[in-house]
Structures are given as structure tokens and as C-alpha cells.
Design a protein with these regions (language model features):
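Cyclophilin-like peptidyl-prolyl cis-trans isomerases
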Residues: 5-6, 12-171
Length: 171
């Protein structure tokens, strides 16, 4: 009986550590109409946002969604199925503000004037985003592909917006 109990506890710890390692090492791969973008998700900074983004990616939510707002020197925004900047998945998130500094390639959750209105829309910063630190939830950092983000069609919305062809999670 003791051996069974020890084995059961050991399996439990193994499962818990596997889940934590998978979440911490998760990379979101965006295949866009301009190329690939690799985003390292930051569950230690925004665990609830990373969990929600993971759900949306696994559901295929982001596949086919356009970059509806691209402002040179500031950011590129996506995640709205209507392409207007007004839509979302229908599930609001409580803000997880941090002191993680917004810089080139930082990925943040878009929201309205209400701090707890983040849903599915997110933005990728170019350079002029430092003032957003502590004001918008950071959940990722682009590791590869900022050259791709820089190629996205500009506008609010762009006349011919680029899109996310597919989004998936990779190790």
C-alpha cells in the first residue's frame, strides 16, 4: 500500500511539473501574409492572459484574422474577428499589469478605456511604446520575425490588410 501511495504522489508531481514546463516554454507561431513571427509567451508575467491566448490559438480563433491597425513607429494590432477594432471573442480578462518594459517586439493585450476589457485583441510594439508599461498587460515578446511585423500594411485599417494565416503553439 505504501509503495502504491508513493507512486501515486510521484506521478502527481511529474504531471504538475510537465504542465508548468509546457506553459513556460510555449511559443506562439504566427504565419502571416508577410512571413512568420515567433512570440515567446510570458506566463510568469500574465498567467491568465497566456492561458486565454493559448485557448484561442488551440480553437483556431486567430486563423484568418487581419491586422486592422498598424501605426509606423508605434504598433501593429490584430485579434478582432470583425476587422474593425471593436470585436473580440466575447470573454473579458482582468488586467495583469506589470513593470515588464514595453520595447521593440513586446506583445500586449489591447483594451478599451476600461483596464479589465482585454479580450482577444493584441498588439506588437515597434519602438514608441515605453509609455504603455504598467498600463497594458504584457503577455509575450517577439523572438523572431520583427522584420515581418515591420512589413505589415499600414493604416487604421490598412486599405489591403495583412492577415494571420494561422496561429499555433510550438515548443
Amino acid at each position: 500500500m505504501r509503495t502504491f501511495f508513493v507512486s501515486l504522489v510521484g506521478i502527481g508531481f511529474l504531471l504538475m511539473s510537465t504542465q508548468n514546463d509546457a506553459a513556460a516554454g510555449e511559443t506562439m507561431l504566427l504565419e502571416t501574409s508577410q512571413g512568420q513571427v515567433e512570440i515567446t509567451m510570458l506566463p510568469d508575467v500574465a498567467p491568465n492572459h497566456v492561458a486565454r491566448i493559448t485557448e484561442l490559438v488551440n480553437e483556431g480563433f486567430y486563423d484568418g484574422i487581419v491586422f486592422h491597425r498598424v501605426i509606423p513607429g508605434f504598433m501593429a494590432q490584430t485579434g478582432d474577428p470583425t476587422g474593425t477594432g471593436m470585436g473580440g471573442s466575447g470573454s473579458k480578462l482582468t488586467a495583469e499589469f506589470s513593470d515588464y518594459e514595453y520595447r521593440n517586439g513586446t506583445v500586449g493585450m489591447a483594451r478599451s478605456s476600461s483596464p479589465d476589457s482585454g479580450d482577444s485583441q493584441f498588439f506588437i510594439c515597434f519602438d514608441g511604446c515605453g509609455h504603455l508599461t504598467g498600463q497594458y498587460t504584457v503577455w509575450g515578446q517577439v523572438e523572431n520575425g520583427m522584420d515581418t511585423v515591420q512589413k505589415l500594411a499600414v493604416g487604421e485599417p490598412p486599405a489591403e490588410p495583412d492577415q494571420i494565416i494561422s496561429a499555433k503553439l510550438v515548443d
